[in-house]
Curated annotation (Swiss-Prot):
Molecular function GO terms recorded: ATP binding; ATP hydrolysis activity; ATPase-coupled phosphate ion transmembrane transporter activity
Name of the protein: Phosphate import ATP-binding protein PstB
Subunit-structure text: The complex is composed of two ATP-binding proteins (PstB), two transmembrane proteins (PstC and PstA) and a solute-binding protein (PstS).
Native species: Bordetella parapertussis (strain 12822 / ATCC BAA-587 / NCTC 13253)
Record localization: Cell inner membrane
Topology of this chain in the membrane: Peripheral membrane protein
Function: Part of the ABC transporter complex PstSACB involved in phosphate import. Responsible for energy coupling to the transport system.
Gene: pstB
Pfam family membership, one: ABC_tran
Length: 258
């Protein structure tokens, strides 16, 4: 297992992280560094804690009562888990795209502009440029440029997910979290999302949770295997899939477990 606790070029550093649903200890003493401008994938069986861990990175768990995190999550050295940290700024810096496409009930244009308006005051011309820029980043602009004022819900499932990614990058975050972004999509849409992830890492630090191990192998630079709330192994994706250090990791990857 690679020692990533003090990795160079770390964008996020997780130190002694524990997470609780009420009294249930869901994540146990996780320590890891997530490198800047790389794609890090979390794999593991259902209920292992990978999506829970992802939601600690932008404190999304605080939307639900009885959940708490202990330890440190450092973004460029700043602990995101302290009460002094502005949660709206955290979510501007650490964007999130969910498993099911969740376009807002408004136009394609306003889906992109909505978050930008919360943090910036742009002129109409500047906002038009930002909307085009974000949709282009999500490889969606050419498909929707003539129907920006139609509902986001009028798009196909794959287009809706790319709209959600565009919405996430529009506020120019530093980290983009993707929680099973392709699980509800067909193979063609999935391939487009995977191509997009490869492009996004040049400007963002990308963290993805996936049940699809082939997707993790294709898309990620680093892979973390979780089991029962513990980080079992974490290292370069090629190493994890070709020569894992732990038998538990090998058993999961080869289908003997999970």
């Amino acid at each position: 297992m690679e020692n990533t606790a003090t990795a160079p070029n770390a964008k996020l550093e997780v130190k002694n992280l524990n997470f609780y649903y009420g009294k249930f200890h869901a994540i146990r003493n996780v320590n890891m560094s997530i490198r800047e401008n790389k794609v890090t994938a979390f794999i593991g069986p259902s209920g292992c804690g990978k999506s829970t861990l992802l939601r600690t990175f932008n404190r999304m768990f605080e939307l639900y009562p009885g959940q708490r995190a202990e330890g440190e999550i450092l973004l460029d050295g700043e602990n995101l888990l302290t009460s002094k940290t502005d949660i709206s700024l955290i979510r501007a810096k650490v964007g999130m795209v969910f498993q099911k496409p969740t376009p807002f009930p408004m136009s394609i244009y306003d889906n992109i502009a909505f978050g930008v308006r919360l943090f910036e005051r742009l002129s109409k011309g500047e906002m038009d440029e930002r909307v085009e820029w974000a949709l282009s980043k999500a490889a969606l602009w050419n498909e929707v440029k003539d129907k920006l004022h139609q509902s986001g819900n009028s798009l196909s499932g794959g287009q809706q997910q790319r709209l959600c990614i565009a919405r996430g990058v529009a506020i120019k975050p530093e980290v983009l979290l993707l929680d099973e972004p392709c699980s509800a999509l067909d193979p063609i849409s999935t391939a487009k999302i995977e191509e997009l992830i490869a492009e996004l890492k040049h400007e963002y630090t990308v963290v993805i949770v996936t049940h699809n191990m082939q997707q993790a192998a294709r898309c990620s630079d680093y892979t973390a295997y979780m089991y029962l709330g513990e980080l079992m192994e974490y290292g370069a994706t090629d190493q994890i899939f070709v020569k894992p250090a732990r038998k538990e990791t090998e058993d999961y990857i080869t289908g003997r477990f999970g």
